[in-house]
Regions:
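Classical Sec-dependent N-terminal signal peptides that target proteins to the secretory pathway
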Residues: 1-26
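Intrinsically disordered, low-complexity N-terminal regions enriched in serine/proline/glycine
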Residues: 36, 61-66, 85, 99, ...
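A general structural signal for short secondary-structure junctions and capping/turn motifs
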Residues: 2-8, 105, 207-210
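Residue-level recognition of hydrophobic positions within alpha-helical transmembrane segments
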Residues: 7, 92, 211-215
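Residues at the start of alpha-helices and the adjacent loop-to-helix junctions
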Residues: 15-17, 70, 210
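Auxiliary, metal-adjacent structural segments of Zn-dependent hydrolase domains
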Residues: 70-132, 141
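Active-site-flanking segments in enzyme catalytic domains
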Residues: 112-257
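N-terminal low-structure segments adjacent to metalloprotease catalytic domains
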Residues: 20-95, 223, 247-257
Length: 257
């Protein structure tokens, strides 16, 4: 009897321990807490996207999700998601990821896409937080579908340019602007947070683009990758078309197989 009670007690201890290992686990490659791999099965991923998801994994690109609210350092917060609630958005993202070559993500040191909701940086809502240092993009999967794709491509462009000096590239790009123009300098400080694509802003695809050269470039890239009629829509905006050529040429060099 004592032996049975002891065994039962040990089983309870093991169950509690295993639960706590998950609850307080840290994903070692990027040191993020409370995340795990998104299952590649037909409960979550549509039939037409299964092969794409598997191919991404074969090339060391993984989609993960937050199963518990997480706080990173003192300035990043993101809430858990119930993956079943975001099936449509998850599949939409996979379709967008298919636009990149099989070697692209390794070329920019991007291996982990972490999905969560209500992502905040310094208490301000943001679509994504990229970090090449840990090959990770934390991304808000709860965004409205109409801005989901462009937000993903915007953040991917930031990852394309991290950890290298692009001063000459930025200078060449900035020369397309009017000589008198100066970027605002602080995306989160400015009142120019309108991210609607607009073909009547001379040299820019959105008002938000006017904040920094990096945001300008990321917005152009996001527009190119998410719009099916970019050239037609911006045909009246010569400077935007010139910027597109610079950005797309830069992208093609990285996106080659």
């Amino acid at each position: 009897m004592i032996l049975k009670i002891t065994n039962l007690f040990l089983k309870i201890i093991i169950i509690i321990f295993c639960f706590n290992v998950k609850a307080f686990s840290v994903f070692q490659p990027n040191q993020l807490p409370f995340i795990e791999y998104l299952p590649i099965n037909r409960d979550i991923i549509n039939e037409e996207n299964i092969n794409t998801a598997l191919k991404l994994q074969e090339n060391r690109f993984y989609i993960l999700y937050s199963y518990q609210n997480m706080k990173i350092r003192d300035n990043i917060e993101c809430n858990e998601i119930k993956k079943e609630n975001y099936i449509e958005n998850i599949n939409y993202l996979i379709i967008e990821l298919k636009k990149y070559s099989s070697s692209f993500f390794n070329n920019i040191n991007f291996n982990y896409l972490v999905l969560c909701q209500s992502l905040k940086l310094n208490s301000i809502l943001t679509a994504g937080i990229p970090s090449n240092n840990v090959a990770t993009l934390i991304f808000d999967i709860s965004l409205n579908k109409d801005i989901l794709a462009r937000s993903l491509h915007h953040e991917i462009f930031h990852m394309m340019k991290q950890n290298k000096d692009y001063k000459s590239f930025n200078d060449k790009y900035s020369k397309i602007n009017d000589k008198e123009f100066e970027y605002g300098g602080c995306p989160l400080c400015s009142e120019s947070i309108d991210i609607s694509f607009n073909n009547n802003i001379d040299g820019f695809v959105t008002e938000y683009s006017k904040n920094t050269v990096e945001e300008d470039q990321a917005e152009v890239f996001a527009a190119v990758m998410s719009m099916t009629n970019f050239d037609i829509y911006f045909s009246n905006n010569k400077k935007v078309l010139l910027k597109k050529k610079i950005i797309y040429d830069f992208f093609k060099k990285i996106n080659k197989e």
